[in-house]
């Protein structure tokens, strides 16, 4: 119904158009090029974060010629989506921006455009993505209006204090793969449990797991 309203047509026609687009995309699919540019997004405090400790182990295993960019969304300036209408969101997207502007438009949008792989660094406190990461995902909608992410791989590093890491992995799949069109590789996420500060690096075999990932 929503696609029919956007396209100014009836639901059956909108369904057939969406189906034709999907078939054409599947028929033309090619394996994405090798990863050369990695973007890592997080909202953690480096001094105390087990999630960032896991990322450091993973990052250490990346090829030396791979470009890696990290953006911290913790500085308090990440406003959530304003809930603009489709036409308003499309308008801002066509201008390369978003209603609120700020770091999301100045830093995150250009970095997402450049990257071949997006790594979401997710600390699990309440079986949900952190508020700043959620706001970031929501505000990627304006970029998505103009840029499809079919050739950008999605990865997740998820560290829980107790349990529930699988719930965050599902949220990443739903929000960024199914909704925002990021390419989902096999075994895209690494889930670990580390409650106490600094305990992640003491987990048995963690360095080998991180290197393999």
Over which residues does each language-model region extend?
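Extended non-globular C-terminal regions
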Residues: 192-193
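N-terminal beta1-alpha1-beta2 submodule of the flavodoxin-like/Rossmannoid cofactor-binding fold
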Residues: 1, 16-145, 185-186, 198-213
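Short, glycine-/small-residue-rich phosphate/pyrophosphate-handling segment
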Residues: 1-23, 149-189
